[in-house]
Amino acid sequence: MFVKVCGVRNAADVAAGVAAGADALGFMLTESVRKLDTGTARALAAELPPGVLSVGVVNGVPAAEAGRLALAAGVRALQLHGRYTREDFAALAHLPLRLLRATHLDPDSAEPPELATGAYGEEMLLLDSPSYGRGERWDLGRLESARPSGKWLLAGGLTPANVAGAIRVAKPWGVDVSSGVESSRGIKDPQLIRDFVAAAKNAAKAENAENVENA
């Protein structure tokens, strides 16, 4: 189970994520209560061991600006939220960055988004709440008619208390958390980070064991 902790802001957050066993840490590079300037993000990304992926997260800025921010921040991956097109992803493909595409299931839309990982040239897909970053859960029952394929991460209102159940229902390749491991908005809690990573990885192990038993 791939676990990404998003919205880390300082060295203590980074240390907590690494110690907990997170596979990726996300740095907000555009408007957010968790936003970092590229210099701070670069310094924090440099602290990560090779096995932990540094991800720059952007929302709504032009693709060229997103790429510039990611390179300035020294991250190894770029996650794009918003109305980005295949052409936008193609324009970023030459950069030395792994690409993540974030989308959501809009209950008011008659046409679901493209849910096949790689459809836009991205390596990973993140399926989030329509109001991402606010800790709001969404109806996982929607996945019955629109389920992602490939390497996809579930996000939106996940916490240490509910992530195991969400994994059982959604069966994602990975999970992403931000506000669910905060003591107050924008303030990460090391214990909650530890609890979340452990709960997610233990749930995945239980799922795998059950699948083997039923094979």
What residues fall within each predicted segment?
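Extreme N-terminal starter segment of soluble prokaryotic enzymes
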Residues: 1-4
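Conserved anion-binding
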Residues: 24, 29-162
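C-terminal helical cap(s) of enzyme catalytic domains, especially alpha/beta-barrels
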Residues: 39-48, 91-92, 178-208, 212-215
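Contiguous, function-dense segments enriched for cysteine-driven chemistry
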Residues: 52, 129, 140, 144, ...
